[in-house]
From Swiss-Prot:
The entry's keywords: Ribonucleoprotein, Ribosomal protein, RNA-binding, rRNA-binding, tRNA-binding
GO molecular function: rRNA binding; structural constituent of ribosome; tRNA binding
Function according to Swiss-Prot or TrEMBL: This is one of the proteins that bind and probably mediate the attachment of the 5S RNA into the large ribosomal subunit, where it forms part of the central protuberance. In the 70S ribosome it contacts protein S13 of the 30S subunit (bridge B1b), connecting the 2 subunits; this bridge is implicated in subunit movement. Contacts the P site tRNA; the 5S rRNA and some of its associated proteins might help stabilize positioning of ribosome-bound tRNAs.
Record-stated family: Belongs to the universal ribosomal protein uL5 family.
Keyword hit for Ribosomal protein: yes
Protein name: Large ribosomal subunit protein uL5
NCBIfam families membership: PRK00010.1
Length: 180
């Protein structure tokens, strides 16, 4: 176990969650299942070069090759046809997931302008947390000079928690800076 965040989970967070929620087994304790990064590139409809740039940026941020997402239906108002490439996403699990979460909590989020913590209300009712990033420049891998367009991305942290309370406690103990 090379990752510090994973060691912290096994040695500190998991026992604390078992104690707090009175779980009978360590397998009942919620854990982070996966992290999905999604970048919607609506302007890829008119210029496909924008999508290639988004894919490259997401590849740098995540450390693995993203998959291109396609439109499910045609929407005339957006000049969109079914099957057109309109975004990119990547799913992180295991070692890379812990590396990314560690980097997000300790390096990237503190680089956000006027950062006072992330909202603690963005849980979905099943213990999963969604976070929107307004600009990709907060990640250290992105070279400020090579970016010709500021893009945001969505980060979904999927947990095995049964409810929001368990999910919030898990992420708080892992070090997620929730706003007070």
């Amino acid at each position: 176990m090379a990752n510090a965040l994973k060691e912290k989970y096994v040695n500190e967070v998991q026992p604390a969650l078992i104690e707090k929620f009175n779980f009978k087994s360590s397998m009942q304790a919620p854990k982070i299942d996966k992290i999905v990064l999604n970048m919607g590139v609506g302007d890829a409809v008119s210029n496909s070069k924008n999508l290639d740039e988004a894919v490259e940026e997401l590849k740098l941020i995540a450390g693995q090759q993203p998959v291109i997402t396609k439109a499910k239906k045609s929407i005339a108002g957006f000049r969109l046809r079914e099957g057109m490439s309109i975004g990119t996403k990547v799913t992180l699990r295991g070692e890379r997931m812990y590396d990314f979460l560690d980097k997000l909590i300790n390096i990237s989020l503190p680089r956000v302008r006027d950062f006072r913590g992330v909202s603690s209300k963005a849980f979905d009712g099943r213990g999963n947390y969604t976070l929107g990033i307004r600009e990709q420049l907060i990640f250290p891998e992105i070279d400020f000079d090579k970016v010709n367009r500021v893009r945001g991305l969505d980060i979904v942290i999927v947990t095995t928690a049964q409810n929001d309370e368990e999910g919030r406690e898990l992420l708080t103990q892992m070090g997620m800076p929730f706003a007070k």
